[in-house]
């Protein structure tokens, strides 16, 4: 993979999201400005790390980063805006929540939200840019914990296992029990379960 060349600036924030594909829950984003004086070993795309490693890195990122922030868009916002626009909104919220304003923002993927500072989308950024890797870890650990909490309230759906993604088990339980208030009503399988599909 081509090595990423950083912009000529000091304070760079990385931004990533987790949860665009699930049928339930918020899309969660994170923004992270790392401290060059306190490097963190082993940063990588959160999906390539074990849960144990993600949890350990999450704590290290929170402790060592110059600034970090979480953003989110709730299911009703996803339904109103669509998943792409809701994700952009959640990214804007994460950047706005940083207590140090970044000079430049690097976003995982191929689209940038409108921000008050220069920004660039980086394809496969979660594997190429440590700031984005750190953001991906914070977002995933946060969203996974939310799904585990939701699983306690609604154990019949298996949220702790599939994290809300449309697995065969989730679709079966959706058909059997209907949708919760946390499901995204604009998503096809949920629409069908509610009898709203045309």
From Swiss-Prot:
A divalent metal cation binds at residues 16-17, 108. CDD domains: RNase_HII_bacteria_HII_like. Keywords: Cytoplasm, Endonuclease, Hydrolase, Manganese, Metal-binding, Nuclease. Manganese or magnesium. Binds 1 divalent metal ion per monomer in the absence of substrate. May bind a second metal ion after substrate binding. It is found in: Cytoplasm. SUPFAM superfamilies: Ribonuclease H-like. Endonuclease that specifically degrades the RNA of RNA-DNA hybrids. This is Ribonuclease HII. It comes from Shigella boydii serotype 18 (strain CDC 3083-94 / BS512). The gene is rnhB.
């Amino acid at each position: 993979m081509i090595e990423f060349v950083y912009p000529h600036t000091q304070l760079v924030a990385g931004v990533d999201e987790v949860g665009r594909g699930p049928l339930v829950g918020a899309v969660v984003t994170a923004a992270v400005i790392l401290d060059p004086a306190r490097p963190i070993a082993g940063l990588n795309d959160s999906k390539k790390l074990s849960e144990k490693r993600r949890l350990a890195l999450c704590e290290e990122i929170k402790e060592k980063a110059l600034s970090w922030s979480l953003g989110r868009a709730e299911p009703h916002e996803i339904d109103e805006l669509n998943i792409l626009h809701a994700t952009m909104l959640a990214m804007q919220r994460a950047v706005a929540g940083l207590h140090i304003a970044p000079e430049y923002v690097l976003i995982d993927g191929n689209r940038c939200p409108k921000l008050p500072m220069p920004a660039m989308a980086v394809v496969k950024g979660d594997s190429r840019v440590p700031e984005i890797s750190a953001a991906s870890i914070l977002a995933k650990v946060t969203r996974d914990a939310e799904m585990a909490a939701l699983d306690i309230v609604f154990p019949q759906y298996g949220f702790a296992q599939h994290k809300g993604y449309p697995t065969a088990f989730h679709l079966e339980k959706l058909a059997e029990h209907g949708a919760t208030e946390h499901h995204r009503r604009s998503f096809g399988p949920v629409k069908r379960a509610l009898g709203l599909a045309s």
